[in-house]
A protein has these predicted regions:
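Flexible, acidic/Gly-rich N-terminal and inter-domain linker regions that tether
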Residues: 1-138, 142-282, 446
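Conserved acetyl-CoA-binding loop-helix of GNAT-fold acetyltransferases
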Residues: 579-598
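Non-catalytic positions within long, well-ordered alpha-helices that form the structural scaffold/packing
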Residues: 324, 393-396, 596, 600, ...
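Conserved active-site alpha-helix within GNAT-family acetyltransferase domains
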Residues: 611-630
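Conserved non-cysteine loop/helix-boundary elements of the Radical SAM core domain that shape
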Residues: 120-138, 158-182, 196-370, 374-431, ...
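C-terminal scaffold of the Radical SAM
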Residues: 184-185, 277-283, 314, 318-324, ...
Length: 635
């Protein structure tokens, strides 16, 4: 293991490029020389080995003569899954505990081990279940994994999934958020010893289990170890066999429509159960949460974005005020369709009018809107889906900032199975699906980001329909094959990602503007000559008359503009690391300054920004001050 590190360092010192292909050659050569299994020298073990030597054997590490610049290059070589922080932020997804859902959609899975619409085999869900759905434990596990893969974790976006957030009790909401912040504030990163596969160079899988008994006492942070024991003592299972058997009887009844998901969840997780006992201490006050938030303003791992998901009918001024106090900056909202007939026959229990109101309220409160849009619903057609999505992207009442657009999946236990068996629903063919998605990409405007085109379901869980995880790549190939010169403008396609950007070539594009029923929106973006995007800002100029007429519902007044998002791309760099990433060249500050000029010229007296907890200090340095739910600046 050490020799591979030394070989990489020597190559870098000679000015050579060590890409993945070159690294594989180095690993294979060293495996042959040592007569070792190349899997024991895999890339995923190199960085933890380097980190352990630097931390625990400083004299040995000093002998490698690694200065700051050489270490930066080495980490670029060893970093696993570099795209995870390519957007400039390290993302941690956490899942709330199973809970009754206010909806009952026809296509929705009914996995009793999960909150509604999620499956226990999804990666984030499996991690959550192994961590008892505890927010502190989930963050600790992901923070550890990101650190061991070499990712910077100064700037964290927390994504809280689990169905309709507002369905949970307010005390649980405050506790869940408080524990997310607490884990980051505590720097709850486990040592290398906590992962026996990474603890020692050359370890085999057979030896990994035995190392657990030899791990140092501080392998897990004390809070993590103590909390795991608390759940174990309460009778909360983490063993797969126990988890499966614990819900088996209820799951069978739900799958054959004898009793519903909500009734079963109450029996499994309500009073008189181990989860009922745990629920007694899963509550916090807003004061406790705000204490953790204040600490996080200057913590090692700062929250620069916080996302919850909800339904349009749950979006009210009161709900938005609460989630803003919790620290949220973005809302994921299940829309699925704008066709009222499709909404009705798929039993969404919402109206298009409710969707319109939810978008207007969310915008006026300053939230980023991340919508879910589903193709191939019961009753849908490919041409109808194309028209519906185009309306969603071009009609002012909607026009989300970000979207997950994915095909409906047939999951065992959902009520859609009966429709399939009766011949009332069929999945689109691959050709139909690619055709719809290719058209959807083309009509997606420059201010919108398509974050996903497929749910993270295991192919084993999908009964029929698309099971290919590389659906986006197939869609992009379809677009290229069309040869019609269609331009893709959506954000994700244009992100500079892990590549750098020549800052001298960047220009500030202010041409993207659009009207909604309640705001005039401006999308400012730093772009390369090729149209790649290095950063952007979302500026809302609210309709003064509307704000004045709804003053009792809104937290702002009519002469206040709103910055809803500032994002600068490039590999996430650690605080104080003056590397070449676009984030370190004042692009964000220049965007904010220009937004202030535009708002002032439009006649607004003040400008608000929906700051995350961990970006408050940044905006204070730019002249903003704390003001209610936002930070504000006089214009």
């Amino acid at each position: 293991m050490e020799q591979i590190i030394l070989n990489i360092l020597e190559a870098l010192c000679r000015g050579e490029t060590v890409d993945d292909k070159a690294l594989v050659k180095l690993i294979h050569a060293e495996a042959r020389r040592e007569g070792a299994d190349k899997r024991d020298l895999a890339k995923r073990r190199l960085l933890p080995f380097y980190q352990r030597v630097k931390r625990e054997e400083p004299a040995r590490w000093a002998g490698w003569n690694v200065d700051a610049e050489l270490e930066r290059q080495l980490l670029q070589v060893l970093r696993m899954k570099p795209r995870r922080t390519a957007s400039g932020v390290a993302t941690i997804t956490v899942i709330t505990k199973p809970w009754p859902c206010s909806g009952d959609c026809l296509f929705c899975p009914n996995d009793l081990r999960m909150p509604k619409s999620y499956l226990h085999a999804e990666p984030a869900c499996a991690r959550a279940e192994q961590n008892c759905f505890d927010p502190y434990l989930q963050v600790s596990a992901r923070l550890t994994a990101l650190s061991q893969m070499g990712h910077a974790t100064d700037k964290i976006e927390l994504i809280v999934l689990g169905g309709t957030w507002s369905d949970y009790p307010q005390g649980y909401q405050a506790w869940f958020m408080s524990e997310l912040f607490r884990a980051l504030n505590d720097d709850a990163v486990a040592g290398v010893a906590a992962n026996p596969m990474l603890a020692r160079p050359g370890i085999s899988r057979a030896e990994a289990g035995r190392l657990l008994d030899d791990a140092p006492a501080d392998a897990l942070p004390p809070v993590v170890a103590g909390r795991r024991e608390r759940y174990r003592a309460a009778g909360i299972a983490t063993d797969e066999a126990e988890l499966a058997s614990g819900v088996a009887g209820e799951q069978e009844r739900v799958d054959v429509a004898v009793g519903g998901y909500n009734r079963a969840v109450r029996r499994l997780y309500g009073p008189g159960t181990p989860w009922g006992e745990v629920a007694e201490w899963q509550a916090a006050t807003m004061e406790e949460l705000e204490h953790q938030q204040r600490i996080n303003e200057t913590a090692k791992h700062r929250v620069v974005g916080l996302v919850i998901e909800t339904r349009p009918d749950a979006v009210t001024p009161q709900a938005l005020t609460l989630i803003r106090r919790l620290g949220c900056t973005k809302i994921q909202m299940g829309i699925q369709s704008l066709d009222q007939h499709l909404l009705d026959i798929n039993e969404r229990r919402i109206s298009v009018a409710q969707i319109e109101r939810a978008f207007s309220l969310a915008r006026l409160f300053g939230f980023k809107i991340h919508a879910h849009f589903m193709l191939n619903l019961l009753g849908a057609t490919p041409d109808g889906d194309k028209r519906d999505y185009e309306r969603f992207m071009t009609e002012g009442a909607f026009m989300p900032d970000e979207v997950k657009v994915y095909p409906c999946a047939l999951i065992e236990g959902s009520r859609l199975v009966g429709c399939y068996e009766r011949g009332e629903w069929r999945p689109y063919t691959e050709d139909e699906l690619l055709d719809v998605l290719a058209d959807d990409i083309v009509v997606t405007p420059a201010f919108c980001r398509i974050s996903r085109m497929i749910r993270d379901f295991s192919s084993d869980d999908i009964m029929v329909g698309n099971k290919k995880p590389n659906l986006r790549q197939l869609v992009e190939n379809r677009l290229a094959a069309r040869g019609d010169g269609a331009t893709v403008r959506e954000i994700r396609y244009r992100e500079i990602s892990t590549a750098g950007a020549d800052l001298d070539e960047l220009t500030l594009d202010e041409e993207v503007a659009y009207e909604t029923p309640v705001t005039h929106e401006r999308f400012l973006q730093w772009v390369t000559p090729q149209g790649k995007i290095a950063g952007f800002l979302r500026l809302s100029l609210p309709d003064r008359a509307f704000v004045a007429a709804h003053a009792d519902e809104l937290p702002t007044v009519s002469d206040e503009a709103m910055i809803r998002e500032v994002h600068v791309y490039g590999m996430a760099a650690r605080v104080g690391d003056q590397g070449q990433a676009a984030q370190h060249h004042g692009l964000g500050r220049l965007l904010v300054e220009r937004a202030c000029e535009i708002a002032r010229d439009a006649g607004y007296a003040r400008i608000n920004v929906i700051s995350a907890i961990g970006t408050r200090e940044y905006y204070r340095h730019l002249g903003f001050y704390d003001h209610g739910l936002y930070l504000q600046k006089e214009l």
